[in-house]
Amino acid sequence: MQDDRIIRETGAAARVAAIVMPVLDALGYRLVRVRLSAQDGLTLQIMAERPDGTMTVDDCEEVSRAVSPALDVEDPIDSAYQLEISSPGIDRPLVRLSDFQAALGHLAKVETSVMVDGRKRFRGQIVGCTGETLTIERDKVAEGEAPLAEIPLDAISDAKLVLTDALIREALKKDKEERRQRKKARRRGEKGGVGDDGTAGEEQPDSAREGPARSASEGE
């Protein structure tokens, strides 16, 4: 089943998303979020990732080179802007059903477009997620409120993880395992006399840590 985004943009950001999504798909990436910010001049942030959730600095640069010409042709924004390509980071936005399911047990902030249980903002541990409903265990329960909040997914306008020690530990563990797998694959290639790049040669050092990555360029 296709893992489409549940949370989407409106206005100019939606126009940008419609332009860049086919470009990202062709390169093997997927769109996380588009956001326009007026702070320090107009900045267009395009957040993307590979299907496995990774996004390196080189990936950001590749995406920037690919989407810039498409944006120049379509010109969805009237004024000059700075283009910023970034990875989701550890405290990432949650925009797909798979994002919410992968975040089970972690603390998150959620905003809704309509009132749910008398409020539009929630903060708590994600304890369940079906195809229709997100269940959060509130970290602070007001008098008269139930500990668990049942939030319809189609009512969510924004959601992101909250940076915690547990989230950092999980991210470091995942990063360590990814490094181990890359090193293992590289050694297999060397035993066969061919490296990952298709050429024979000595083992190359590990690349820089694949954390939140950014690449910025000027747009018009």
Curated annotation (Swiss-Prot):
Instruction: Look up keyword Flavoprotein and say if it applies.
Output: no
Q: Where in the cell is it found?
A: Cytoplasm
One GO biological process this protein is involved in is:
ribosomal small subunit assembly
| Cellular component aspect of the GO annotation | cytosol
Which Pfam families has this protein been placed in? DUF150_C, RimP_N
Q: What is its main location?
A: cytoplasm
The annotated region (Disordered) lies at 173-220
Q: Which UniProt keywords apply?
A: Cytoplasm, Ribosome biogenesis
What domain of life is recorded for the organism?
Bacteria
Q: What does this protein do?
A: Required for maturation of 30S ribosomal subunits.
Q: Please give the family membership noted in the entry.
A: Belongs to the RimP family.
* Protein name per its UniProtKB record: Ribosome maturation factor RimP
UniProt lineage? Bacteria, Pseudomonadati, Pseudomonadota, Alphaproteobacteria, Hyphomicrobiales
Q: Which gene encodes it?
A: rimP
